[in-house]
Swiss-Prot record:
GO CC terms in record: cytosol
Species this chain originates from: Fusobacterium nucleatum subsp. nucleatum (strain ATCC 25586 / DSM 15643 / BCRC 10681 / CIP 101130 / JCM 8532 / KCTC 2640 / LMG 13131 / VPI 4355)
Keywords: ATP-binding, Chaperone, Cytoplasm, Nucleotide-binding, Stress response
Record CDD domains: HATPase_Hsp90-like (cd16927)
Recorded name of the encoding gene: htpG
Function recorded in the entry: Molecular chaperone. Has ATPase activity.
Protein name as it appears in the record: Chaperone protein HtpG
Region (C): 535-607
Length: 607
């Protein structure tokens, strides 16, 4: 029988070195590669049998076998697939198909940069065995050959290839494991079972470890939806994504067309425990041909849906050299966009049909949606704006922006007020007057709410307006405005003196009839609101953080204004201004600078 000793071509040597030292940073995925090759070999045999019915003979129960021999430190993977002839082994294993071509050399150079699909294009996953083995023995037989073939190499530049007597069709690969504790675990039963479950659990063919089948041949996402109950989804979710709770929602997608894929997505009930830590990573599990490729594929899901768990299985996706990072290709982008639309659509359905369930979702994950609206200066506004909900003064319940607009009648602006709580907002002086007018206000209790609305600018052509802004008006009563302006002109000295006392604490002092029944109110002028200032100051202790341009508004109809007028030339004037200013600070949730001074002034004025 034929026997030869050969030398790897230069490119193959280089690839071997690249595979061992550069491409696979995760040692354990060698088993995934070899099982995937075995799966492909059976696929090829089944395809061939469609036109050559005699090829299977009496060996038509397809299977993959794994065994270990601790004494000899070997791990063996075998299949009863198509096998290879002597020439095929020499071409596909010894020299690698196309290895002498200009294309391969170019791709090899690109592989060093980590961005090319060598495995997918040239089938070199076999060489990943050298990550854990210092010698590999391959025995194979094609149904079209009388003899089998043995191939042996230590990965040192040479290989032996010879014909052998072999009866059974298929391929057996024996890895002679390297010495060292880090390789010993690959001889343990539990480790092999764990790796198969992790990477190859849904291979189409049964994987045997001894007499035990250790994989599930048909994944849940490829089963008929009619076969599945909520319990099936719930148990799969909890076992796969390590959650104690059932998911809030599952989405099972089977897409056919130019790009075919299956997707199974889950919205959890609770935020992941590490959600706000640097360890948290978004992404979906990725399978290709039922082979696990990646734990967290970020490209499949946008940042604002980062809380979603799940997986995608697509046979046609192009993979990079290590099968760990996907190339940025058109297929992936299409799948990602489709998933984004489907998730949005499902959330909108819940919002419409089960408000209580949506509110439960919103309290956990609403911040991610709001952050998505803010991202890129509101670029995602159109996609996400109809998922937003806020508590409304209309009925103290959550409302959508569309529902608000449908109720606003002839009003031109969507009113909102930032507040520590719904109760705190309800008792603000301005809110009482707006309630009397029958005008609805969105109550923003999350510190990022106002940033979200500012990023949006408007909804359905209606601009957002804070009732704490200096240009907010209860009405367009020109006569009333002129009356207030006249009072201000008459008390110009009072206003200037108050501003002089407060110095740079406020940018100006004004009289206003738009602050309800309160004696005074702190308003914001310009783009930065009072609530934004508080939020930014809590994020950092930096004194250089931007401040809101504050306006102290005084109610000319309040009794304290009359007292202020009568004391303009007395020592009580500054005390009254101090009380009005600090009172306004407290109403807006700010800390007053000197509580003792405030109490002292307040007590001295109570006569």
């Amino acid at each position: 029988m034929k026997k030869e000793e050969k030398i790897f071509k230069a490119e193959t040597k280089e690839l071997l070195n690249l595979m061992i030292h550069s491409i696979y940073t995760n040692k354990e995925i060698f088993l995934r590669e070899l099982i995937s090759n075995a799966n492909d070999a059976i696929d090829k045999l089944k395809f061939q049998s469609l036109t050559d019915t005699d090829i299977l003979k009496d060996n038509d129960k397809f299977r993959i076998d794994i065994s270990v021999d601790k004494d000899n430190r070997t791990l063996t993977i075998s299949d009863n697939g198509i096998g290879m002839t002597y020439e095929e082994v020499d071409d596909n294993i010894g020299t690698i198909a196309k290895s002498g071509s200009k294309l391969f050399k170019e791709q090899l150079e690109e592989a060093k940069k980590g961005d090319i699909d060598i495995i997918g294009q040239f089938g070199v996953g076999f060489y990943s065995g050298f990550i854990v083995a210092d010698k590999i023995t391959l025995e194979t037989k094609s149904p079209y050959s009388e003899n089998g073939v043995k191939w042996i190499s230590s990965g040192d530049g040479n290989y032996e290839i010879e014909e052998i007597a072999k009866q059974d069709r298929g391929t057996k690969i024996t890895l002679h494991l390297k010495d060292g504790d880090e390789y010993n675990e690959f001889l343990e039963d539990w480790k092999i079972k764990d790796l198969v479950k992790k990477y190859s659990n849904y291979i189409r063919y049964e994987i045997y470890f001894g007499d035990e089948v250790i994989n599930s041949t048909k994944p849940i996402w490829k089963k008929d939806k009619k076969e599945l109950k909520d319990d099936d989804y719930n148990e799969f979710y909890k076992a796969t994504f390590h959650d104690w709770n059932d998911p809030l929602l599952h989405i099972n997608l089977k897409v056919q067309g130019n790009i075919e894929y299956n997707a199974l997505l889950f919205i959890p009930k609770k935020l992941p425990f590490d959600y706000y830590t640097k360890n948290f990573k978004r992404g979906l599990q990725l399978y290709t041909k039922n082979v696990f490729i990646m734990e967290k594929c970020e490209d499949l899901i946008p940042e604002y849906f980062n809380f979603i768990s799940g997986l995608v299985d697509c046979d046609s996706l192009s993979l990079n050299i290590s099968r760990e990072i996907l190339q940025q290709n058109a297929e992936l982008q299409v799948i990602s966009k489709n998933l984004e639309k489907k998730i949005t659509s499902e959330l909108e359905k819940i919002l419409k049909n089960d408000r209580e369930k949506y509110v439960e979702f919103w309290k956990e994950f609403g911040r991610s949606i709001k952050a998505g609206v803010q991202d890129m200066f509101g670029m995602n506004k159109e996609k996400l704006q109809d998922l937003l909900i806020f508590v409304s003064s209309h009925d103290d319940k959550y409302t959508t922006l569309k529902e608000y607009v449908d109720r606003m009648g002839d009003n031109k602006e969507i009113l909102y007020v930032p507040a520590e709580s719904v109760d705190a907002a309800k008792y603000l002086p301005k809110m009482e007057k707006l309630k009397e007018q029958g005008r609805e206000v969105l109550i923003l209790t999350d510190k990022i709410d106002e940033f979200t609305l500012m990023a949006m600018r408007d909804y359905s052509g209606k601009e957002f307006k804070s009732i704490n802004s200096s240009d907010f008006k209860f009405s367009d009563d020109k006569e009333k405005e002129e009356e207030v302006k006249k009072i201000a002109d008459e008390n110009k000295e009072l206003i200037e003196k108050a501003k002089e006392f407060l110095k740079d604490k406020v940018s100006e002092v004004e009289l206003s009839n738009n602050i309800g029944n309160s004696a005074s109110s702190l308003l914001a002028k310009g783009g930065l609101s009072l609530e934004m200032e508080k939020t930014l100051s809590e994020m950092t202790n930096n004194n250089d953080m931007p401040k809101a341009e504050k306006v102290l508004a005084i109610n000319p109809e309040h009794v304290l204004f009359n007292r202020l007028k009568s004391s303009v030339n007395t020592e009580d004037f500054n005390k009254l201004v101090d009380v009005l200013y600090n009172q306004a600070l407290l109403l807006e949730g700010f800390n007053i600078e000197n509580p003792a001074e405030f109490i002292k002034n307040l007590n001295s004025l109570i006569k």
